[in-house]
Curated annotation (Swiss-Prot):
This is PPE family protein PPE11. Signal peptide: none annotated. Residues 181-196 have a biased composition (Low complexity). The keyword Secreted applies. It comes from Mycobacterium tuberculosis (strain ATCC 25618 / H37Rv).
C-alpha cells in the first residue's frame, strides 16, 4: 500500500520516461542465462561424480577404502546437486523479473499517448467558445486521470513482482570439504576444544545477515565461504581482512583456553603464531603495499601530519629574544644661516649713555663688539633691520665708520661658527660609524649645511652703535649737544605695500659730528 502511494505521487510522464529509457531487460536476461549455464555445469559434475563413486564401490577398489572415499565425497555430491537446483531457481526468478518488466512496459502509457492527451486538451480549451467543449474537456481530463492511475498501478505491480522474485532466490551455500570422517572429527576438536562456541555461532549469524549471505563463516571447520583462512592471500580484497579478523579471534580464544588448562602448550601455540603465522600475513600486506604505493602514502599522511603538529609545540619551550632596538640619533639643532647681530644680543657691559667726565675711558670699540657678539641668544630682541627688505645695494656707503671698524670681530664670529658646525658634522659621522648596521639602513636628512661664509671682502653682519657711548681721546669731555640714537622706528606701509627705504633719523642728528666723536 505504501509503495502504491509513492508511485501515485508522480505524474505518468515520469514513470513512462524512466521505464522506457532504462537499460531494459537485457542485463537481467544475461544474468538468468548465466545462472542456467552454471546450474547445468553443477548437474554435469554431480552426474560425473556419482558415476565415479558407483564405479569405485563396484570395481577393483571395493572394500573399506572405497567405502571411506564414497562417504567423504557424498557431502560434496549432495552440495553439487543442491547448487545445480539453486542455480536453476535463480535463473527462473530472474526470468520472472524480465517478464514483469515486459508486462509493465506494455501496460505503461507511452509518452506519445500522454503528449497526444495534452495536445488535445490544449486545443479544446483554446476553442471552448461559449462552453461548447466543456464535456469533451472533462472526458479528456478523466482519460488523463486514468493514465495516471494506470501508470502508478503498473509500477507498484512491477515492484512487487520483482522484489518477491529476487528475495526468493536461494542463497549459495559453500561447498563442504572432502575429508575422512575421523579426520573431520579431529579437526573440529582441535579447533573448538570440545564443541562449538556460542559466541562464534552468534558472530557467524551476524555476518551472514549483514552481508546478505555473502560471507558464510564456519567456526567449527575454520573456513570462510568454504575456504580455509590461509586461502585468502590478497590484502586488496575485503575477504582477506575478514578472514584475518576471524582467524585472530579464534587464535586468541584458543590461547585463552590453553592458558588456563596447559600454560606450556599455550606458550608453544603463541610462539608458533609469532614465528610462522603472523609473519606470513605481514609479508602479504607488505607486498601489496609495495605494489600500491599510493595507498601507503594515503595511510601515512595523517600520521606525518600528527608528528608535524607535535613538533610545532617545541616553539612553546621558549620564545626567541628579539634584537635590541637601537634608538635613532636625535637630529642636530638647526643652525641659522645668518648669525644674529651684536645689536640683537643682550648687552652686559656697555651703558646706553655716554660716561661722565673724568671717568675711566671705555674699552675699544672692537673689544666691546666682540664681547657682546660671543654670547648669542636663541631669541633676539628684534630683527637687525625693521625697515623694508633690509639694506640695499648702497648700504655700505651709508654705514658709519665705527661699524666698519667692527669687521674683524664679525669675521672671528663667522670662523667660530664654522668651526662649531664642522665639529658637529664630525660627531655625527662618528655616531653613524659606531651605529650597528641593520637590514634596514637609516638615512638622515641633513637640512643645515652651516652658515654661509661670505667671500673675502664682503660683509653680511654689522656691529651696532647702541650702547657704545661717546668715543674720543681719554680725558676729554664729550659734546652733549647731540642726542644719541635711541632705536629704529618702522613706518606703516602704504596701500601698495611700499614703505620707506631709508631709516628715520633724528632731525638734530648730525651724522658727520657723530662719526667724528665730537
Amino acid at each position: 500500500m505504501t509503495s502504491a502511494l509513492i508511485w501515485m505521487a508522480s505524474p505518468p510522464e515520469v514513470h513512462s520516461a524512466l521505464l522506457s529509457s532504462g537499460p531494459g531487460p537485457g542485463p537481467v536476461l544475461a544474468a538468468a542465462t548465466g545462472w542456467s549455464s552454471l546450474g547445468r555445469e553443477y548437474a554435469a559434475v554431480a552426474e560425473e561424480l556419482g558415476a565415479l563413486l558407483a564405479a569405485v564401490q563396484a570395481g577393483v577398489w571395493q572394500g573399506p577404502s572405497a567405502e571411506s572415499f564414497a562417504a567423504a565425497c557424498l557431502p560434496y555430491l549432495s552440495w553439487l546437486t543442491q547448487a545445480s537446483a539453486d542455480c536453476a531457481a535463480a535463473a527462473a526468478r530472474l526470468e520472472a523479473v524480465t517478464a514483469a518488466y515486459a508486462a509493465a512496459l506494455v501496460a505503461m502509457p507511452t509518452l506519445a499517448e500522454l503528449a497526444a492527451n495534452h495536445a488535445t486538451h490544449g486545443a479544446m480549451v483554446a476553442t471552448n467558445f461559449f462552453g461548447i467543449n466543456t464535456i469533451p474537456i472533462a472526458v479528456n481530463e478523466a482519460d488523463y486521470v486514468r493514465m495516471w492511475l494506470q501508470a502508478a498501478t503498473t509500477m507498484a505491480t512491477y515492484q512487487a513482482v520483482a522484489d518477491s522474485a529476487v528475495r526468493s532466490i536461494p542463497d549459495s551455500v559453500p561447498p563442504p570439504r572432502i575429508l575422512k570422517s575421523n579426520a573431520q572429527s579431529q579437526h573440529s576438536s582441535s579447533n573448538n576444544s570440545g564443541g562449538a562456541d556460542p559466541v562464534d555461532d552468534f558472530i557467524a549469524e551476524i555476518l551472514k545477515i549483514i552481508t546478505g549471505g555473502r560471507v558464510i563463516w564456519d567456526p567449527e571447520a575454520g573456513t570462510v565461504n568454504g575456504l580455509p583462512y590461509d586461502a585468502y592471500t590478497n590484502p586488496g580484497t575485503l575477504m582477506w581482512w575478514i578472514a584475518r579478523s576471524l582467524e585472530l579471534l579464534q587464535d586468541f580464544q584458543e590461547f585463552a583456553k590453553l592458558l588456563f588448562t596447559n600454560p606450556v602448550k599455550a606458550f608453544q601455540f603463541l610462539v608458533d603464531l609469532i614465528l610462522f603465522d603472523w609473519p606470513t600475513h605481514m609479508l602479504q600486506l607488505a607486498t601489496w603495499l609495495a605494489e600500491n604505493p599510493q595507498l601507503l602514502v594515503a595511510a601515512l599522511t595523517p600520521a606525518i601530519s600528527g608528528l608535524g603538529a607535535v613538533s610545532g609545540l617545541a616553539g612553546l619551550t621558549g620564545l626567541v629574544p628579539q634584537p635590541p632596538v637601537v634608538p635613532a640619533p636625535a637630529p642636530d639643532a638647526v643652525v641659522p644661516t645668518v648669525l644674529p647681530l651684536a645689536g640683537t644680543a643682550t648687552p652686559t657691559t656697555a651703558p646706553a649713555s655716554a660716561p661722565a667726565a673724568g671717568a675711566a675711558p671705555g674699552p675699544p670699540a672692537g673689544t666691546a663688539t666682540a664681547t657682546s657678539a660671543s654670547v648669542p641668544t636663541s631669541a633676539g630682541g628684534f630683527p637687525p633691520y625693521l625697515v623694508g627688505s633690509g639694506p640695499g645695494i648702497d648700504f655700505d656707503a651709508g654705514t658709519p665708520a665705527g661699524s666698519r671698524r667692527a669687521q674683524p670681530a664679525a669675521d672671528n664670529v663667522t670662523a667660530v661658527a664654522a668651526a662649531q658646525v664642522s665639529a658637529r658634522h664630525q660627531a655625527r659621522r662618528r655616531r653613524r660609524a659606531a651605529a650597528k648596521e641593520r637590514g634596514n639602513a637609516d638615512e638622515f636628512v641633513d637640512m643645515d649645511s652651516g652658515p654661509a661664509i661670505p667671500p673675502s671682502g664682503e660683509r653680511d653682519a654689522w656691529a651696532s652703535n647702541s650702547g657704545v657711548g661717546g668715543l674720543g681721546f681719554a680725558g676729554t669731555a664729550s659734546n652733549e649737544t647731540v642726542a644719541a640714537p635711541a632705536g629704529l622706528t618702522t613706518l606703516a606701509d602704504d596701500e601698495f605695500q611700499c614703505g620707506p627705504r631709508m631709516p628715520m633719523l633724528p632731525g638734530a642728528w648730525d651724522l658727520g659730528t657723530w662719526d667724528r666723536g665730537d
